[in-house]
From Swiss-Prot:
EC numbers, comma separated: 2.5.1.141
PANTHER family xrefs: PROTOHEME IX FARNESYLTRANSFERASE, MITOCHONDRIAL
Protein name, entry field: Protoheme IX farnesyltransferase
Membrane topology recorded in Swiss-Prot or TrEMBL: Multi-pass membrane protein
Length: 303
């Protein structure tokens, strides 16, 4: 049997579930929430017509999905060596040879190209922000910082917080204070979220020689960093006062709840893994609740 035939068989075995793994669909979906919220708030706060903005919102979501999925696929291509070492990554199609490198790269660059075309069709700022997100995630995070510094998570938070900016700019064409506030929410959220995950997988990261903060500096140092980011996040809702006092109060309570949960780790004999799991779950719910709340509150202003 020829090598080409074997490779074609490999790619033919990639199903939809495996494709979702390749493009990290869970991560993409999580980022689409703030992207949509950014676009929606731009529609409401700048008095755009919702009906006339629907095509822009859909094109923005489609383009964002493609560039994020393509960047994640490229990340999977680059990380194959360390993924083969980490037990939790063994089911990835890129690890068990369910997709060839050639097809993986074609998928990645194809998605990013089409995604960028979509964003540039909206306006130049959207396309530029998309490019910044791609370069930041692939180059500064995946290729450089992830393998060389414990600041990798913070560095990766910059491109990770771009989606709400793209959403806003797709409608308004320029960045505003509200868009920056949404960016800051996602930016501050990411270290807490990913440090919690890294605590649970610190042995895996150490095995793969990835300098994640818990693996290099230990649990105590990591929880202090998480708490610092929680404190930084606390006043950010004040920047969204134009959504009303009710939103600011509810968002602040959401932040205070997270801080309260974070403080439980300073009790004696607290279970590190259990606490990290609780913080991780809260982080997932936080992002959804925060941005859904922003959308709902903005809807009430239209009634």
């Amino acid at each position: 049997m020829s090598k080409e035939h074997t490779l074609s068989q490999n790619i033919s075995r990639v199903n939809f579930k495996e494709l979702q793994q390749i493009i990290k669909m869970g991560l993409v979906q999580g980022n689409l929430i703030p992207a949509f919220a950014g676009a929606w708030l731009a529609v409401v706060m700048t008095n755009h017509s919702f009906l006339s903005s629907i095509p822009q919102i859909l094109l923005m979501l489609f383009g964002s999905t493609l560039i994020m999925g393509g960047a994640c696929a490229l990340n999977n291509y680059y990380d194959q060596d360390i993924d083969r070492i980490m037990p939790s990554k063994q089911n990835r199609p890129t690890v068990n040879n369910r997709i060839t490198d050639q097809n993986l790269l074609l998928l990645s660059f194809g998605m990013m190209l089409v995604g960028e075309i979509c964003l540039f069709l909206l306006n130049i700022p959207s396309g530029v922000l998309g490019l910044m997100g791609i370069v930041g995630y692939v180059s500064y995070y995946s290729i450089w910082s992830k393998r060389h510094t414990t600041w990798n998570t913070v560095i990766g938070s910059f491109p990770g917080a771009v989606p709400p900016l793209i959403g806003w700019v797709a409608i308004e064409g320029q960045i505003s204070l509200t868009a920056i506030a949404l960016f800051l929410v996602v930016f501050c959220w990411q270290p807490i979220h990913f440090y919690a995950l890294a605590i649970k997988r610190k042995d895996e990261y150490a095995l793969a020689n990835i300098p994640m903060l818990p693996s290099v500096k230990g649990f105590k140092r990591t929880r202090v960093s998480m708490f610092i980011w929680l404190i930084i996040l606390l006043p950010v809702p004040l920047l969204l006062i134009n959504l009303g006092v009710v939103f600011v109060v509810l968002a602040t309570l959401l932040n205070l709840g997270w801080i309260a949960l974070g403080l439980t780790t300073f009790k004696k004999n607290s279970d590190q893994t259990k606490w990290a799991t609780q913080m991780f779950i809260y982080s997932l719910n936080y992002l959804v609740i925060f941005f859904v709340l922003a959308v709902i509150v903005s809807l009430l202003t239209l009634i």
